Every structure is written in C-alpha cells, then in structure tokens.
Design a protein with these regions (language model features):
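Helical element adjacent to the flavin cofactor pocket in flavoenzyme catalytic cores
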Residues: 5-62
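A short, glycine/Asx- and small/polar-enriched loop/turn
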Residues: 1, 43-50, 100, 183-187
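Active-site substrate-recognition segment that forms the wall
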Residues: 57, 67-196
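Glycine/charged-rich beta-loop-alpha catalytic/anionic-binding loops adjacent to active sites
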Residues: 2-4, 195-196
Length: 196
C-alpha cells in the first residue's frame, strides 16, 4: 500500500529569494512596479479595464489576478461567475540543523481532501521541517500558531514511522510558524481568461 509520494526530480528553493529573483527578472524585462498602491475597485470597459487605486486610476487591456487570498474579491468585481476563496492556514515545526540528514528528498503523504498533507522536507539552509497542516479559517490575516495544532504536529513527529523511520527529536524544535494559502471552493486552480 502506498503511503507517500516520491518525486525524484523535485527540488527545494528559498521562496523569499525566488520571489526577489522573479521580481528582478521582471523589472529587467520592462515591468514597472507600483509599490504601496492599493486597488480599491476595477471597472470593465469596452477596451479593457480601469483600476481605481489610492494613487489614481490606471487603464489596462488585461489584468493578471495574482491576489492570492483576495483573488475572489477582484475576480468578482468584473465577473458574473462568482468565486469564493477560503483561507487555509498551515502550521509548521522547524528543527535545528543538528537533526541532520534524515533523508535526501521531500516526502509527501498521499493527498487527501484538505490537500497534500503534512510533508517532511528541508530548507535550503539545511533545517528539517514538517508541515503544513490544513485548517480552513475565516481570518485571512490570522497567521498565529495554535497550541492544539502544534501538539498534533509534535505527536506526529514523535511517532515512529510518520514519514520517517524513527521519531524526530522534539527537543530540537527551534521554531514554529503559520501561513495561509488560497483555497477555491471548487478545489481548482483558476488559470484562464474570464468567460464573461
């Protein structure tokens, strides 16, 4: 019986450095960033869109909606086909580098209805971690960790055989954190042009 996914060609990146590198590449290729500019509403026009912001209006022929947790807000301003995004909070446990190399790849359990499950992996700096959990939450800004969820993660880490062949040393946990990801109610990534 299969209990985990193996992706031999998978890799690990630093999400912060990757985002900076992508931004630098975009800038070198002509993208003009509008920092500290908040879009308050979008109007559909005959030839495109008008984006109303705190720094004035912008006209454009196309919009790429990459608003993450708030993608539904902007989508629903211009489309009759409404969507709803739920914030799905994930919590992580990070271990000290002294935990060492438990294995040389990311291990992911078989996906369930709440997502890919709690993975075991490394950062590019060599810290081992487990997570994320998956809890649907109302507060899209709420990035606090919870004792109940962290206790469940610790229980998994201390058990023999959850993604590793031996229990993980809980005295080597150095931090925990949480993040939220966008989950569309129909369980789909939406990568397409609006139909209307």
């Amino acid at each position: 019986t299969a209990t985990a996914l193996w992706a031999p060609t998978g890799g690990i990146v630093c999400p912060f450095n990757l985002a900076i590198a992508a931004g630098e590449n975009a800038s070198m290729n002509g993208v003009e960033f509008q920092f500290e500019t908040e879009a308050s509403s979008i109007e559909k026009t005959k030839d495109g869109y008008i984006i109303h912001t705190n720094k004035g209006d912008m006209e454009t022929k196309a919009i790429v909606n990459a608003a993450g947790l708030y993608a539904d807000v902007f989508h629903n301003m211009v489309s009759e086909n409404k969507i709803h995004i739920t914030a799905r909070k994930g919590e992580y446990l990070f271990f000290d580098k002294s935990v060492g190399t438990i294995f040389n790849t990311t291990v992911v359990p078989l996906p369930g209805k709440m997502g890919k499950g709690i993975a075991a992996s490394y950062t590019i700096n060599g810290n081992f971690f487990i997570g994320p959990t998956a809890t649907d939450v109302e507060d899209k800004e709420g990035l606090n960790t919870t004792a109940e969820i962290l206790d469940k993660l610790k229980e998994m880490a201390a058990s023999d055989g959850y993604l590793t062949r031996f229990p993980l040393p809980l005295n080597k946990v150095i931090t925990s954190f949480a993040g939220a990801r966008a989950h569309e109610d129909h369980h789909e990534f939406i990568v397409q042009e609006l139909e209307d």
